[in-house]
Swiss-Prot record:
It comes from the Bacteria. Pfam families: EFG_C, EFG_III, EFG_IV, GTP_EFTU, GTP_EFTU_D2. GTP binds at residues 17-24, 81-85, 135-138. GO terms for cellular component: cytoplasm. One of its GO terms (biological process) is ribosome disassembly. Residues 8-282 form the tr-type G domain. The gene is fusA. This is Elongation factor G. Belongs to the TRAFAC class translation factor GTPase superfamily. Classic translation factor GTPase family. EF-G/EF-2 subfamily. InterPro entries: EFG_II (IPR041095), EFG_III (IPR009022), EFG_III/V (IPR035647), EFG_IV (IPR047872), EFG_V (IPR035649), EFG_V-like (IPR000640), EFTu-like_2 (IPR004161), G_TR_CS (IPR031157). Keywords: Cytoplasm, Elongation factor, GTP-binding, Nucleotide-binding, Protein biosynthesis. NCBIfam families: EF-G (TIGR00484), PRK12740.1-3 (NF009379), PRK12740.1-5 (NF009381), small_GTP (TIGR00231). The lineage of its organism: Bacteria, Bacillati, Cyanobacteriota, Cyanophyceae, Synechococcales. The keyword GTP-binding applies. The keyword Nucleotide-binding applies.
């Protein structure tokens, strides 16, 4: 089957931003103007196409990354609309991993918000080229050039306007395109009647000034263009487009556009810019992976290369399990068998679909560069690689942050017990930041996630989708433990009970691992002192012991264990004996490695009238907060601080009373840090008292 669109005419893009910048509305307009939907859906009416879960439509926020295909100017555009709420940061993370380009949407009034910085960092982590759409130009207080400057200052990006608004706030009537040097005037409310016109006289000087700056900025990044610019003093429209595209692909330039998606102004020009400036799959670096022999290899974006794809999202719905994949190379056909190289398991591809939000179009194959979904995969979870059985490779996976908050959950009736475990299994398969565990002391089921809203939505889904009635406990902070020094540990398990005994013996070296590594295991056994078949069980025993640390029973993270020695018995040794010996050695070593308690630190930004600045800072300091920055602009103060999550419960109520209801704040996870000794002692003694 031939391709619908050649690879150079495919764009895999994400639309990302902070809450309320208007991402979903922008996506809706893109779908309307490109012909996917024939009626405009509004977020506040609960009718947006990409907000397809019941909770999204009720709350007017996007929770999951919905993938949609559309076309514009003979190009296939695959769009992922990502959530702006920090509790759903994994959705942004997983979409950034599989995209080739991003439209970052900013509010023309609010400008750069804390969540914008998070999204920008995530795009940086995966080196995703991007462009900016400054939305909501129709709102009171909209200031296009001020937002452009904020992007330069706060995000350290070489942002450059390639458009200017004609009028602002209620008088937004059109847009000047600095590249084509033309004005586009909107003649009807639907944004379908657009007049191409000369630039209005009163804006000619401003447009000329910005166009000259744009030509200079573009020429600086390209030797060929700088010669033309120095020789002729200007660049043609085609030369400008070529230069902007090169700048975007090399991460040297971020073009900034403007408009109002809600008022139907500027969206078609955004689509034009996606086609003109954002990369095709063949414009970005080939995906890297590791071969079975441990060597690195790359897979080019080519239908003729061996098949490889990354599963970036798993979803359960009434029709079964849906696994979203990004095709990196080769062709995936319906009915074929493939290899999950991450889990070393064979999978059958029963059906393939391309999605238009909650509508599906069945296809016979997916090709390099496509975003699609597979039905019928049994063992594949988020971050797994799918590939040819003859050409195995494991692709780079996703960065998955540690959860920061947990609650106990128990079924209301015995009949709900089985339904609860099925629901929790399905939800944790979908969302790697959602963890399920059992509290050893109370035997309660504990669920952990990225924030209160995250857990609230998941509990809501249990009720709606799985019909589980459950009681939920009060939120608890997800502490962690780690080690600060190195040591040796030894575990010898020897039991003689009548006939056959049990014998396992291991010696390990323990040291702190890099942050984010979790549990790292290295085997340095030589001469067969521990046979190969017992190394896995010994490692598993240590890994399981990590789940409950030595200080207060919290999971132990960022620990490197090297197996250096041991002994075995020809008759009495078994996998179970070595698993127990591994656990004993781990416990022995940890106690000597200066274990410490870690707590989640949150990046908090508070906005309030500047009269309350002193009270806000004083209150944050009393919560063990470290103020990292503050500014006052137009009578509004902004304070950035890092505060332990444990101190932030009930903060919204306190802030309201402190600022007479005029203060707002945003909060997102920053990192784990060591708990001060006096606070740690109280937490440890409380936990030991409960055990």
């Amino acid at each position: 089957m031939a391709r619908d669109f050649p690879l150079e005419r495919v764009r895999n893009i994400g639309i990302a931003a902070h809450i309320d910048a208007g991402k979903t509305t922008t996506t809706e307009r893109i779908l309307f103007y490109s012909g996917v939907v024939h009626k405009i859906g509004e977020v506040h009416d609960g009718a947006a196409v990409t907000d397809w879960m019941a909770q999204e439509r009720e709350r007017g926020i996007t929770i999951t990354a919905a993938a949609i295909s559309t076309s514009w100017q003979d190009h296939r555009i695959n769009i992922i609309d990502t959530p702006g709420h920090v509790d759903f940061t994994i959705e942004v993370e997983r979409s950034m991993r599989v995209l080739d380009g991003v439209i970052a949407v900013f509010c023309a009034v609010g400008g750069v918000q804390p969540q914008s910085e998070t999204v920008w960092r995530q795009a940086d982590r995966y080196s995703v080229p991007r462009m900016v759409f400054v939305n909501k130009m129709d709102r009171t207080g909209a200031d296009f050039l001020k937002v452009n400057q904020q992007i330069k200052d706060r995000l350290k990006a070489n942002a450059f306007p390639i458009q200017l608004p004609i009028g602002a706030e209620g008088d937004l009537s059109g847009i000047i395109d600095l590249v084509s040097n033309k004005a586009y005037l909107y003649k009807n409310d639907l944004g379908t009647d657009i007049e191409e016109a000369p630039i209005p006289d009163e804006m000619k000087d401003e447009a000329l000034e910005w166009r000259s700056k744009l030509m200079e900025s573009v020429a600086e990044n390209d030797e060929e263009l700088i010669e033309i610019f120095l020789d002729k003093g200007e660049l043609t429209e085609d030369q400008l487009k070529k230069g902007i595209r090169e700048g975007v692909l090399k991460h040297g330039l971020v073009p900034v556009l403007c408009g109002s998606a809600f008022k139907n102004k500027g969206v078609q020009l955004v689509l034009d810019a996606v086609v003109d400036y954002l990369p095709a799959p063949i414009d970005v670096k080939p995906i890297q992976g590791v071969l079975p022999n441990g060597k690195e290899d790359v897979r080019p974006s080519d239908d003729n290369a061996p098949f490889s794809a990354l599963a970036f999202k798993v979803m359960s719905d009434p029709y079964g399990k849906l696994t979203f994949v990004r095709m990196y190379s080769g062709v995936l056909s319906k009915g074929s068998y493939v290899m999950n190289s991450t889990k070393d398991a064979k999978e059958r591809i029963s059906r393939l679909v391309i999605l238009k939000a909650d509508e599906r179009e069945e296809v016979d194959e997916l090709r390099a560069g496509d975003l699609g979904a597979v039905l019928g995969l049994k063992n594949t979870t988020t971050g797994d690689t799918l590939c040819n059985t003859d050409d195995p490779i494991v692709l780079e996976t996703l960065f998955i942050p540690e959860p920061v908050i947990s609650v106990a959950v128990e079924p209301k009736t015995k009949g709900d017990m089985e339904k609860l475990s099925k629901a929790l299994q399905a939800l944790s398969e979908e969302d790697p930041t959602f963890r399920v565990s059992t509290d050893q002391e109370t035997n309660q089921t504990v669920i952990a996630g990225m924030g209160e809203l995250h857990l609230e939505i998941l509990v809501d889904r249990m009720l709606r989708e799985f019909k589980v009635e459950a009681n939920i406990g009060a939120p608890q902070v997800s502490y962690r433990e780690t080690i600060r020094s190195s040591s040796k540990g030894e575990g010898k398990y020897a039991r003689q009970t009548g006939g056959k005994g049990q014998y396992g013996h291991v010696v390990i070296e323990m040291e702190p691992a890099e942050v984010g590594k979790g549990f790292e295991f290295v085997n340095k056994i030589v001469g067969g002192t521990v046979p190969k078949e017992y190394i896995g069980p010994a490692s598993n025993g240590m890994k399981e012991t990590c789940e409950s640390g030595v200080l207060a029973g919290y999971p132990l993270i960022d620990v490197k264990v090297t197996l250096v020695d041991g002994s075995f018995h020809d008759v009495d040794s078994s996998e179970m004996a070595f698993k127990i010996a591994g656990s004993m050695a781990f416990k022995d070593g940890v106690k000597k490695c200066n274990p410490v308690l870690l707590e989640p630190m949150m990046k908090v930004e508070v906005e309030s009238p500047d009269d309350f600045l002193g009270s806000v800072i004083g209150d944050l300091s009393s919560r063990r907060g470290q103020v990292e920055g503050q500014s006052v602009d137009d009578g509004l103060s902004k304070v950035q601080a890092k505060v332990p999550l444990a101190e932030m419960f009930g903060y919204a109520t306190q802030l309201r009373s402190m600022t007479q209801g005029r203060g707002i704040f945003s909060m997102e996870f920053a990192n784990y840090e060591e708990v001060p000794r006096n606070v740690a002692e109280a937490i440890i003694s409380k936990n030991q008292g409960n055990s």
